[in-house]
Structure formats: C-alpha cells, structure tokens
A protein has these predicted regions:
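Short beta-strand segments enriched in hydrophobic/aromatic residues
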Residues: 42-44, 98-100, 114
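A short beta-turn/strand-edge loop motif at beta-sheet boundaries
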Residues: 31-34, 46-51, 104
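Short beta-strand-to-coil "C-cap" segments at the C-terminal boundary of structured domains/repeats
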Residues: 111-117
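Noncatalytic modules at the cell exterior or secretory-pathway interfaces
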Residues: 33-38, 85-109
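Terminal beta-strand-rich extracellular "head" domains
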Residues: 43-83
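Short edge beta-strand/loop segments characteristic of extracellular beta-sandwich folds
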Residues: 27, 39-45
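Short beta-strands within extracellular/lumenal beta-sheet-rich domains
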Residues: 15-30, 76-84
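Transition segment at domain starts
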Residues: 1-23
Length: 117
C-alpha cells in the first residue's frame, strides 16, 4: 500500500549559531521517495588582514562540495552558500554535515535547511 504525501511539504533545519560544525539528519520515510532542496550557509565577519573562511559539505559520509575564500566586506559580514538537490528513496535517511574553518574571521552563523518539493 502506497502512503500519500503529507498535506504540507517536509521542512528540516539546524541552526548551529557560531559553531564550526552543523549536522542535519532527515529521517527515512518507509513508504515514499522524497525530493529535497538543500541550502547550507556560513556567515562570517572579518577580524583582520588576511581573513579567510571555508566550508565543506558531506552527504551520507561522502564529500559533496568544498570551498575556501578570502573574507571581504570589512565592518559587515561575508557569507558562503551552497545549494543542492537530493532524491531520497523510501526507507533511506539523509545525513548532511557542514564543517567550517575561519582564520582572522569570526563565525556568526552556520545553517542547514532542507525543504521537500
């Protein structure tokens, strides 16, 4: 018996604040395949010359994306974003881990959001 989709799309979110690692686990649905739009965001503020920030996104234990960049916009914030889509077969969870680094920059916010479409 096939289970109907919920009346509202699933939304999952983790806000790690100024933490350096965020983990979002979307639990499995035993009956249906789901599709998610996923956004990962790091916000930093430069503390001095040579400031840099980096973000690595791992999905189910494998590298999905990584980037390092100079931190710009002195006196304000700078950010790094990664957006991707993932099909989640019935019975399978999805684990997203975002790891960050900051040199001469302060982490302000680390966020992962997933919305079913």
């Amino acid at each position: 018996m096939k289970k109907a989709a919920p009346a509202t799309p699933e939304r999952w979110r983790i806000d790690a604040g100024d933490g350096d690692v965020a983990t979002l686990v979307i639990p499995p649905d035993s009956f249906r395949t789901r599709h998610f739009e996923i956004d990962c965001r790091l916000v930093v503020a430069a503390l001095g010359a040579g400031a840099q920030h980096a973000m690595r996104v791992d999905v189910d234990g494998g590298l999905e994306w990584t980037r390092s960049a100079p931190t710009h916009n002195p006196g304000h914030t700078d950010s790094m974003d990664y957006h991707f889509r993932r099909e989640l077969p019935a019975g399978r969870p999805l684990r997203i881990v975002v790891k960050t680094q900051a040199r001469q920059a302060r982490r302000m916010r680390l966020l992962i959001e997933a919305e079913e479409n």
